[in-house]
Design a protein with these regions (language model features):
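Nucleotide/pyrophosphate-binding catalytic subdomain
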Residues: 1-168
Length: 168
């Protein structure tokens, strides 16, 4: 049934991909998801919006320190590289290349930046590369944050003209 869609955005929440106690990737869960993505990717353009950078990075920063914005941003910078590595490693098994795109609210509200982001995603998809998108939490301040990646995923779906948005 999903194969009838031409463009799909899959949004993955922190609790789906990161073990909340261990602050590590749920590796087996991600492997199963990547297998499904590989099957769908044969006939459908896919974009993944993935949360979890702060949750992953918080393992390296004391929990009490995560009260300040700059500490959450530091955790995001630590966790984001792990997220990208996991996606790259898991999808490489299926000969699928991935890219990383980090967006802020301004990237979808400023016309020039919106078009640039859309064109970048389109260019990647035309090369059968799956963009893995997250909010750029290392630079986003409270005033310019999406708030959560559900909103970011909806905006990306609208940006690329997706036929389906899946929230996990």
């Amino acid at each position: 049934m999903i194969k009838k869609f031409k463009k799909i955005v899959i949004k993955i929440g922190s609790n789906s991909i990161v073990d909340p106690k261990l602050k590590t990737i749920k590796s087996k869960w991600l492997e199963k998801l990547c297998k499904d993505i590989a099957l769908i990717h044969k006939t459908t353009k896919i974009v993944v919006v993935c949360s979890g950078a702060i949750a992953l990075g918080s393992k390296s920063i004391s929990r009490s320190a995560l009260r300040k914005l700059e500490d959450k941003q530091a955790a995001a910078s630590i966790g984001q590289i792990e997220l990208a590595y996991q996606w790259r490693t898991k999808l490489k098994k299926y000969k699928i290349k991935v890219s990383q795109i980090l967006l802020t609210l301004e990237d979808s509200e400023t016309r020039r930046r919106f078009l640039n982001a859309r064109n970048t995603i389109s260019s990647l998809q035309n090369r059968n590369i799956i963009p893995i998108i997250n909010e750029n939490d290392t630079v986003a301040t409270e005033e310019i944050k999406y708030g959560d990646n559900d909103k970011l995923a909806a905006r990306v779906a609208q940006m690329i003209g997706a036929d389906l948005l899946i929230l996990l």
